[in-house]
Swiss-Prot record:
Belongs to the hssA/B family. It holds the Pfam family Coiled. InterPro entries: HssA/B-related. This is HssA/B-like protein DDB_G0295685.
């Protein structure tokens, strides 16, 4: 009885691990999409709507997207200062 219980609990742990991996892998394409949408924004930087949208999307999907979106926002604000030439890279 205890052997069967431990095997079933191991099976549950594996299924939980798989579902976590799926959720993280599903959030990485959206973080790259938000990176692309900010990267190709005008020289003035991202609009407030884009920044708020990325932050709200990050709260709904996971903390990795929040960190990525904040770093991308900082990059787009400092990029025109460090590289004054405008346009997509």
């Amino acid at each position: 009885m205890t052997i069967l219980a431990s095997i079933s609990s191991i099976g549950n742990v594996k299924s939980i691990t798989k579902s976590k991996n799926v959720s993280f892998s599903s959030s990485s394409p959206s973080s790259s999409q938000s990176l692309n949408s900010i990267q190709y924004s005008p020289c003035g930087g991202p609009t407030l709507g884009n920044v708020v949208g990325n932050l709200v999307g990050g709260v709904l999907i996971g903390t990795g997207v929040i960190v990525g979106s904040v770093l991308n926002t900082v990059g787009t604000i400092t990029n025109p200062i460090l590289h004054p030439s405008c346009g997509c890279n």
